[in-house]
A protein has these predicted regions:
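Accessory recognition modules or surfaces
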Residues: 2-4, 41-45, 50
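Anionic group-transfer/hydrolysis microenvironments
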Residues: 8, 36, 53
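Short, flexible hinge/linker loops that cap or flank conserved catalytic cores
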Residues: 1-2, 24, 83
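Dinucleotide-binding Rossmann-like beta1-alpha1 core, especially the glycine-rich loop
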Residues: 48-110
Length: 110
């Protein structure tokens, strides 16, 4: 019998590799095609920042989920992905104070 796949994914960057991983976890037979090597394109040249501060609640919720995934990588996937929790500082002009306070309240709800 010829080998088959339920899903063929073209591109082994972060999106393609993540999709392949999650589909395979759900029992889907996946074939991932990459013309060079995994993370050869923009993914491999990325600074790898997992940003947490967004203006929209949906984006902030997605960022929180992503953060937890990278933080718990070893337990979820196995091995070390190189994630290191660091910090971030934003020096805002005074006219942004109220907007930033509202943003902080939104983040605290998440």
């Amino acid at each position: 019998m010829k080998p088959t796949a339920d899903m063929i994914i073209i591109g082994g960057g972060i999106h393609g590799a993540s999709l392949a991983f999650h589909l395979a976890q759900r029992g889907v037979k996946v074939l991932l095609l990459e013309k060079s090597y995994l993370a050869a394109g923009a993914t491999g040249r990325s600074s790898g920042l997992v940003r947490m501060h967004y203006d929209l609640e949906l984006e902030s919720r997605l960022a929180w989920e992503s953060f937890q995934y990278f933080r718990d990588w070893r337990e979820r996937v196995g091995g070390d992905c190189g994630f290191r929790r660091t910090g971030f500082i934003y020096i805002a002009p005074p006219e942004q104070t109220e907007a930033l306070k509202a943003n902080i309240q939104m983040h605290q709800r998440i």
